[in-house]
């Protein structure tokens, strides 16, 4: 979900506008917010920070180019938050379908227009220009090869994994996968809020009834190049098609197990287990769709661990990709609250380290080359 300002910004980038073309204001979404200040014991608060001192951690889905739109804070302030929160790395995502999107009265994003050829690719390219600058400000080294991660961790450097959310920017051209790979992108989320040339989405009725032939070609090309396929926003038939096409494990960067809400962006246990069955990872998502707290988010993580096992769970905050009034995090100073709350809930230190980054390190080193 997104405030109108972010769509205006994406469309402006599609017109080669300045990165300062932010439109002020945010939509009052009909969802409930909550802060993520931990209620963990003082001992576990200290122990949670110690986990982050000793083990690499990563946020698997963020949009730092939108920080100023929502939080009214600068990227320099977020750089200080990264340091204070002991974050080891982050996926920095452009939005591939941004120029097509608008907001329904209920706050739901949808594809409202069909951009002219080249607009979505151009917008994504310019967003990546912005994200490159943000990575430098955040003190992050781009991961381009599998060995880059181990080298950065050994050197106590933070890592940026450049990503695009929504394969719409490919505009049906397989050669664009190679172009963005050469540009430094190492993860593509196949679909977002527009039913595109690759497949259907969770939030609209099916059109293709799964992954398209072009979608299968994109998955295979990403495997060949050494890119991580992200299946967030993809319904079960698309995930099944991607699994059949892929020779490597994949990621669902931000979702939760749907046991009670009926929220379209959550997934069934069968869906989650399919992703995990090939070694994949699912990012637990701290979104508040009802009165929620840090404890509710830990419930989501525990439900996911119970479903797929602790080796297949990570954290994807969607930081600044949704209005901060509907997620449980506003900046990375709150990152240590997650391991603290997990420890307080009875998770062991080794398992907490896996969830915070160890599982994603394994997945990245198995897929990125």
Predicted segments, located by residue:
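Acidic, glycine-enriched loop/beta-strand segments at the rims
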Residues: 311, 366-369
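C-terminal helical cap
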Residues: 294-295, 350-364
């Amino acid at each position: 979900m997104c405030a109108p300002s972010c769509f205006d910004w994406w469309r402006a980038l599609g017109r080669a506008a300045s990165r300062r073309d932010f439109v002020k204001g945010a939509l009052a979404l009909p969802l409930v917010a909550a802060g993520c200040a931990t209620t963990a014991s003082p001992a576990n608060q200290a122990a949670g920070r110690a986990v982050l001192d000793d083990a690499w951690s990563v946020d698997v889905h963020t949009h730092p180019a939108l920080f100023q739109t929502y939080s009214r804070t600068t990227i320099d302030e977020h750089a200080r938050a990264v340091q204070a929160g002991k974050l080891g790395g982050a996926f920095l995502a452009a939005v591939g379908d941004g120029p097509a999107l608008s907001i329904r009265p209920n706050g739901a994003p949808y594809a409202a227009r069909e951009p002219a050829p080249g607009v979505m690719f151009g917008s994504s390219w310019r967003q990546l220009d912005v994200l490159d600058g943000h990575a430098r400000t955040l003190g992050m080294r781009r991961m381009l090869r599998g060995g880059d991660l181990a080298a950065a961790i050994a050197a106590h450097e933070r890592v940026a994994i450049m990503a695009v959310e929504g394969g719409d920017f490919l505009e049906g051209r397989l050669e664009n996968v190679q172009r963005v790979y050469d540009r430094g992108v190492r993860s593509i989320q196949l679909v977002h809020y527009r039913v595109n040339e690759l497949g259907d989405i969770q939030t609209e009725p099916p059109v293709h009834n799964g992954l398209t032939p072009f979608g299968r070609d994109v998955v295979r090309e990403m495997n060949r190049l050494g890119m991580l396929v992200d299946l967030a926003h993809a319904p079960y038939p698309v995930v099944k098609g991607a699994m059949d096409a892929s020779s490597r494990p994949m990621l669902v960067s931000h979702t939760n197990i749907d046991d009670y809400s009926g929220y379209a962006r959550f997934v069934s246990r069968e869906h989650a287990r399919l992703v995990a069955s090939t070694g994949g990872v699912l990012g637990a998502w701290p979104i508040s769709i009802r009165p929620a707290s840090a404890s509710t988010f830990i419930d989501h993580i525990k439900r996911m661990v119970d479903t797929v096992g602790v080796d297949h769970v990570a954290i994807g905050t969607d930081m600044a990709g949704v209005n901060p009034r509907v997620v449980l995090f506003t900046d990375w100073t709150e990152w240590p609250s997650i391991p603290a709350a997990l420890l307080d809930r009875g998770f062991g230190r080794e398992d907490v380290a896996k969830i915070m980054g160890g599982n994603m390190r394994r997945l990245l080193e198995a897929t990125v080359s």
